[in-house]
C-alpha cells in the first residue's frame, strides 16, 4: 500500500512519528518537496534523530530512501546531516539513499537573496527561514535553476553559475549586500558534491519499478497544508505544494499509484498564537499540561500561547490534503 503522510496545519504536527510507524511495513520512503527549512524529529529508544532532508526510513535497515525531484537541496546542509547521522551510528550508502538528478540545488547566494528579499519586505516580512528555499524555487520556476545533474558536470556547473550570478549579484548589490564570485561558489560546494555524487541518479524509474512490483511506498510530507503555496495562508506560506499533489509531482509517480492519504493534525495546533482559537488563560495551560505534558512545540515561541484546534479550518485542509 502506498501512503502519503501530510500535515493538516502549519507543520510540526508529528508527521515524523507517523511516518516512522508506517515505515516498519514499507519498502521505500520518499521525500518529494521542500528543503532543509523543515525537519522531523524521530526518537528510537533513547536516541533522538533530527532529519531535514534525509527521509525517516534511513533509520530502518533494508529500507530504500529517495530524495525526489521536487526537493530543493542544499548540498552542504545535506552532507552535514548525513555526517551527523553517521556519527549516531546510522549507515548511509548509495543503495539506501538515492537523490534525484532532477532535484534543484540551493546555492550560497540563494540564502543571501532570501535574506535580502525578507529585509526589503519590511513590515510585510513573512518570516522566512532564510535558508534560500524561496529563491531556489523561484529560479526553478523561471528556468534559471541548477539541478544536481548540472552540478555533477564541473565545466557546465561553472558556466551556469557564472551566468546565474550576473542576475543574483545585481539584486544583492541593490540591497547593499556582498556579491558572489563563481570560483568561490564552486569551491564552497565542491566537497559536498563529491560526497553526494554516488547517491545521485534518475530516481523515477526506481520508484516506478517499486510501484509495479507491488512494494509499499511511504511519501513523507514536509511542513503542512496551511503552508501550501496555493492553498495555504498566502503569503505566509512556503514555496512548494505541501498537499498530496506535491508528493506526486515531486516524485514522478502518478496519482493512481496512491492508495491512501493520512492527514496528521494536532489537538493543540502550532502557529496558533494569533489565531482566533488561541488561548492565554492559565486554565488552558493546565489542561494542556495534563494532556501532553510540558508544551514546547505547540506553544508559539514568541508568545508562549497555544490554542484549540480550529476544526472548520482543518476539515477543508483535510479534503485537499
Where are these regions (language model features)?
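Non-transmembrane, aqueous-exposed alpha-helical and coiled segments at domain scale
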Residues: 1-321
Amino acid at each position: 500500500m502506498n501512503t502519503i503522510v501530510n500535515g493538516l496545519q502549519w507543520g510540526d504536527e508529528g508527521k515524523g512519528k507517523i511516518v516512522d510507524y508506517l515505515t516498519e511495513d514499507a519498502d521505500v520512503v520518499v521525500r518529494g518537496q521542500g528543503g532543509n527549512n523543515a525537519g522531523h524529529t524521530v526518537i528510537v529508544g533513547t536516541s533522538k534523530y533530527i532529519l531535514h532532508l534525509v527521509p525517516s526510513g534511513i533509520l530502518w535497515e533494508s529500507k530504500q530512501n529517495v530524495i525526489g525531484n521536487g526537493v530543493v537541496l542544499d548540498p552542504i546542509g545535506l552532507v552535514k546531516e548525513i555526517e551527523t547521522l553517521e556519527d549516531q551510528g546510522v549507515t548511509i550508502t548509495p543503495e539506501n539513499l538515492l537523490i534525484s538528478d532532477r532535484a534543484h540545488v540551493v546555492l550560497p547566494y540563494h540564502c543571501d537573496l532570501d535574506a535580502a528579499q525578507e529585509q526589503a519586505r519590511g513590515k510585510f516580512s513573512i518570516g522566512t527561514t532564510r535558508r534560500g528555499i524561496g529563491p531556489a524555487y523561484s529560479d526553478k520556476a523561471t528556468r534559471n535553476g541548477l539541478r544536481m545533474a548540472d552540478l555533477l558536470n564541473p565545466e557546465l556547473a561553472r558556466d551556469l553559475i557564472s551566468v546565474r550570478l550576473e542576475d543574483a549579484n545585481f539584486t544583492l548589490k541593490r540591497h547593499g549586500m556582498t556579491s558572489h564570485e563563481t570560483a568561490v561558489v564552486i569551491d564552497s560546494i565542491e566537497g559536498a558534491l563529491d560526497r553526494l555524487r554516488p547517491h545521485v541518479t534518475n530516481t523515477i524509474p526506481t520508484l516506478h519499478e517499486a510501484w509495479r512490483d507491488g512494494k509499499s511506498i511511504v511519501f513523507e510530507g514536509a511542513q503542512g497544508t496551511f503552508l501550501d503555496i496555493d492553498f495555504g495562508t498566502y503569503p505566509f506560506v512556503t514555496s512548494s505544494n505541501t498537499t498530496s499533489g506535491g508528493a506526486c509531482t515531486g516524485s514522478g509517480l502518478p496519482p493512481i499509484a496512491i492508495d491512501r492519504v493520512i492527514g496528521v493534525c494536532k489537538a493543540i495546533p502550532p502557529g496558533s498564537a494569533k489565531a482566533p482559537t488561541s488561548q492565554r488563560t492559565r486554565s488552558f495551560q493546565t489542561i494542556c499540561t495534563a494532556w501532553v505534558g510540558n508544551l514546547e512545540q505547540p506553544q508559539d515561541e514568541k508568545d508562549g500561547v497555544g490554542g484549540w484546534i480550529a476544526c472548520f479550518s482543518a476539515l477543508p485542509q483535510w479534503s485537499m490534503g
